[in-house]
Amino acid sequence: MKQSTLLTVTSLLSILLLSLHLTSDFIHNAGELSLRGLFISVLILVVLLYGTLVLAERRSGHVIMLLGALAALGMPVIHLMTARGVAGAIDRPYAFIFVWALLCLGVTGLFSFFLSVQGLLGLKRGQQG
């Protein structure tokens, strides 16, 4: 499979997992749900989606996918660094899905990060040659 196709697929998977994770956060922390937070979340996801699907072969698309990869990779880290951490969700009915989603976000985020960096380096070499 081509590297650009792999990057697109893993970026789309990361976007899907991020949207599911944000939904879970909004549901389980209903006090944090606001129109502003929802608008910002939608805006970020749309930018990630646009960069992945429309700008995939451009440097700007690779940069957007790189930022999305960092967001996906950072989600497990952020949750582990909070006071409650993942342990705060372990006794809840949704614990398995929550931890599984964090694990998948970390995996797809790291893989997308590597592919984005390789893609950016490939674009740079292609423009010099």
Residue ranges and their predicted role:
Residues 30-44:
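Loop-to-helix transition at the N-terminal end of transmembrane alpha-helices
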Residues 6-19:
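Alpha-helical transmembrane segments
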Residues 1-6, 22-34:
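Short juxtamembrane and helix-loop transition motifs at transmembrane-helix boundaries
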Residues 3-9, 52-53, 102-129:
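Membrane-water interface at the C-terminal end of transmembrane alpha helices
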Residues 29-33, 78-101:
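Interfacial non-cytosolic loop connecting adjacent transmembrane helices
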Residues 44-51:
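Hydrophobic, membrane-inserted alpha-helices
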